[in-house]
Amino acid sequence: MHGNGGQPAAGGSESALSREGQPGPSGAAQGQVISNERSPRRYSTRTINGVQATNKFTAVGNPSLQRDPDWYRWNYNHSIAVWLRECSRSHAKICNCGQFRKHWFQECAGLEDRSTQASLEEAILRPLRVQGKRAKRKLDYHYSQPTPNRKKVYKTVRWKDELADREADFTPSEEDGGTTSSDFDEDINFDIGGDSGIVDELLGRPFTTPAPVRIV
């Protein structure tokens, strides 16, 4: 109790509670103003959608937390989001049930072993294999170009090998009369003589009747 009608006694001082006011349920206490300037504790505050937020967790015993629980809401939500992301990544490594939140309930808290599913790896890699063909075609051109430390890389012709494999696998049927392509292999001379009208037409000469192609 202060003497002199509520005035502090000589040599005394007011308590912090009577000087600053009773902490309220929200907002700054009486006699205090929340600012966005950097505090002596080396962290800043800002207003997000009307909510005061800081970039550092506030201790539970801090008067700021006691005045306004929204003071730490921004940090709390960010920490929850980071935790859920880590839960999802860790769950994907050990289980294949699809959602890690299922393990929070007792009726579906069992784990499904990923090693028992043989087709899982194939199902995961299938999109990569299909989509990788287009990327490989784009990279083949750049890979074949010369660089200061490498000569030009020429592609290997594979169509001849594929054609040989097809001929080896060919089986004559009754509709073909039991004939194969070797029965029709004859020496054909595709040489066009000098008196051919095609040559004259290409050279711009007067058109003449083309000579027939001679088959030897």
From Swiss-Prot:
The keyword Hydrolase applies. InterPro entries: HEV_TT_vir_Orf2/Gyrovir_Vp2_N. Pfam families: TT_ORF2-like. The keyword Manganese does not apply. Its EC number is 3.1.3.16, 3.1.3.48. Residues 172-187 have a biased composition (Acidic residues). Induction: VP1 and VP2 are detected 12 hours post infection, while VP3 only after 24 hours. It catalyses: O-phospho-L-tyrosyl-[protein] + H2O = L-tyrosyl-[protein] + phosphate; O-phospho-L-seryl-[protein] + H2O = L-seryl-[protein] + phosphate; O-phospho-L-threonyl-[protein] + H2O = L-threonyl-[protein] + phosphate. Residues 21-32 have a biased composition (Low complexity). It comes from the Viruses. Residues 1-50, 166-187 are annotated as: Disordered. GO terms for molecular function: protein serine/threonine phosphatase activity; protein tyrosine phosphatase activity. Keywords: Early protein, Hydrolase, Protein phosphatase. Transmembrane segments: none annotated. The active site is at residue 95. May act as a scaffold protein in virion assembly. May also play a role in intracellular signaling during viral replication. Belongs to the gyrovirus protein VP2 family. This is Dual specificity protein phosphatase VP2. It comes from Chicken anemia virus (isolate Japan 82-2) (CAV). The lineage of its organism: Viruses, Viruses incertae sedis, Anelloviridae, Gyrovirus, Gyrovirus chickenanemia. The gene is VP2.
